[in-house]
Curated annotation (Swiss-Prot):
Belongs to the DAP-DAPL1 family. It comes from Danio rerio. This is Death-associated protein 1 homolog. Transmembrane segments: none annotated. The lineage of its organism: Eukaryota, Metazoa, Chordata, Craniata, Vertebrata. Residues 95-105 have a biased composition (Polar residues). Pfam families: DAP. Keywords: Translation regulation. The keyword Transport does not apply.
């Protein structure tokens, strides 16, 4: 690619126009001239920090819960496990020996 021109080119909408090369448009990125000032640690910035409010008690069915005392992590884990079947399935070998005889056309 050729080097960018030394003189200032006309900008549209605040940026340089795209260059067409090989049938595709290529956007030329330019460096912004705006410098962001560094944030300084002042006493004023610490005054406006928010404090996390204490957790409010949760009411379940009219009773105030006590956090992990009412619902332990182990009890919650059991509630999310897959249920164990009460009856066992038959072995798959019995189903393979059955043949269905159908007449041909």
């Amino acid at each position: 690619m050729s080097s960018p021109p030394k003189e200032k080119t006309e900008t549209r909408a605040g940026h340089l126009p795209a260059v067409k090369a090989g049938g595709m448009r290529i956007v030329q990125k330019h460096q912004s001239a705006i410098e962001v000032p560094d944030k300084k640690d002042d006493k004023d910035s610490t005054e406006y920090e928010t404090v996390i409010p204490p957790k409010l008690p949760v009411v379940v069915s009219g009773v105030v819960t006590k956090g992990d005392k009412d619902f332990t992590p182990a009890a919650a884990q059991v509630a999310h496990q897959k249920p164990v079947p009460s009856a066992q399935k038959l072995p798959a070998g019995q189903h393979l020996n059955q043949h269905i005889h159908q007449p041909r056309k």
